[in-house]
Amino acid sequence: MRPTLGRTRETLFNWLRPYIHGCTCLDLFAGSGALGLEAASLGAAQVTLVDSNREIIEALSANVGLLKAENCQVVHSQAEHFLRSAQSPYDVIFLDPPYKQPKLLESALESLYRGGLIGGHIYLEAEHEKLLHDLCERFRLSITRTTSAGTTHSVLAEP
């Protein structure tokens, strides 16, 4: 797991602040849940946190309970399986797959695109900036913001 750095997270939410309140969010590779929980604290109407690791899900569920984050749903599922059953687009999507697993990013984008689930802003994080730009071009996403911290590159894009 590669948690999103605090500085990167702060930059991201400065970008997203005008759009978060009342929106639906998907944190597909939730890990620590930092991105989804931050969105929930900023007034997102619904945040879905998805991860395939049972221990992570148990910790996320406990944190959601402690925070009394009633606008959060924690889902134990593989990303692909979850996306096959998703019904409607998300206003904000966070795609921050585990470190050194770029294929997960590509397959998640493929499923999101094919399912018509990208309803607004999408945050992508990876080790290689070129990969992010190539994926955005392939899936017809316009990059609105970029940032880098160390070896981690991030973009905010929209359809």
Model-derived segments and spans:
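Class I S-adenosyl-L-methionine-dependent methyltransferase catalytic core
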Residues: M1-P159
